Each structure stands twice: as structure tokens, then as C-alpha cells.
Amino acid sequence: MKDIIIVGAGHLGLDVYALIKEINAVKPTWNIKGFLNDFPVDLDQYCIYEKVIGTIQDWIPGKDEHFALAVGSPLGKEKVVNLLKSRGVVFETLISPRAVVAKSAKIGEGSIIISTSSIGTCAKIGKFVVVGNTIVSFNSSVGDFTNTASYVNIYRNVIVGKRVQIWTHSVILNNVDDDAIVGAGSVVVAKVKAGTKVFGNPAKRMPF
């Protein structure tokens, strides 16, 4: 068993915790040492008995420690990655044993593929991406530091940029540029420009 520390103790941290337990149930792989978080969190309320063992800002990695990134904000996790990698942290790519991943698909460093996700033929998942119970269809791509919430469907040949947040039950039929936000339940039929927020069916631009 290898020691692993979960970076972030919010809702995504709980999902990553459950994912590691799911992996261990199939093949014992990880010993969860605890969480890193920059503010106090009571994990007992979630029936999680591992503790917050330090802060992200102050943690110095020890020998043979592995890390799972569970920071929810796309921009925030890029900053965390840059900070911790400068100290020598190595992030693990974690894939649920219940996910369906095509042999020709590519998944980048530090990405998290949760439960019943499906990654299609020739699909490309960048670095530090969260794929949450999402369908990523064939020949589509998802850029670095992007998050998809549960029950998102990314259509074939679609390109999703970097640091994008796509919320639950959205359908992505056209490209989404960097730093955009797609609101819950949206159907994207027209290209989403960089740095914009869209919502609705069909998805339309909304003020921040």
C-alpha cells in the first residue's frame, strides 16, 4: 500500500476519498494519510475519520508520499499545482474501476475520473481534469484544469478548453473556450467564448 494525501477537503475531496476507497475495494493500493486544507473542516460529519493533517500552503512532501488533487476551482487548482510541484509533489491520476475508458483515449497527469464516466475512442483528457460521472464522446478533448460535474455529456469532436467549469446535467454540442462556465442543465449549441458564462437551453451568455 502506498501513502496518498488528498489535497483539498471540500466536496470534491469527499468524492476523491470515495474514489480511492472504490479503487482499494478492487485492488488494495492506497493508504489515505489524510487531507490538506487551508482552513479547518469537520470531516466527522461526513463519516470520514481521516483528518486534515496540514495546510496546502505549508506542506512539505515527505519521501514516498503521493498526492491526489481535489481542489474544486479550476483557477485555484492551477495555482495549487504550481505551488506544490515546485516542492517536488507528484500527483496521481485516479480512474474509477467502474469507468469505461477506451484504450485509445489519453488521460493526463493528476486527472480524476469518477465512477460511471465514459471516455470514448481517441478522446483526450488534459492534466488535472475532473471528469465526474460524465460522457466524453469519441475524438473530443477536455483541457487542463477543467471540471465537469455529474451527468455531463460532451458530444463527439467537441473541444473544451482549459480551466472550464461545466455544471451538472449539461450537454455540450459545441466548443467551449478557456475559462468559461457552463451553468447546470445547459445545452450548448453555439460556441462558448473564452471567459464567458452561459446558461439555459439553448445556452446563452449571462453576466458574472
Name each region found by the language model.
Residues 2-20:
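Glycine-rich adenosine-cofactor-binding loop
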Residues 12, 41, 204:
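Conserved Rossmann-like nucleotide-cofactor binding loop
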Residues 20-24, 84:
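Active-site catalytic pocket residues across diverse enzymes, especially alpha/beta-hydrolases
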Residues 40-100:
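Phosphate-bearing ligand-interacting subdomains
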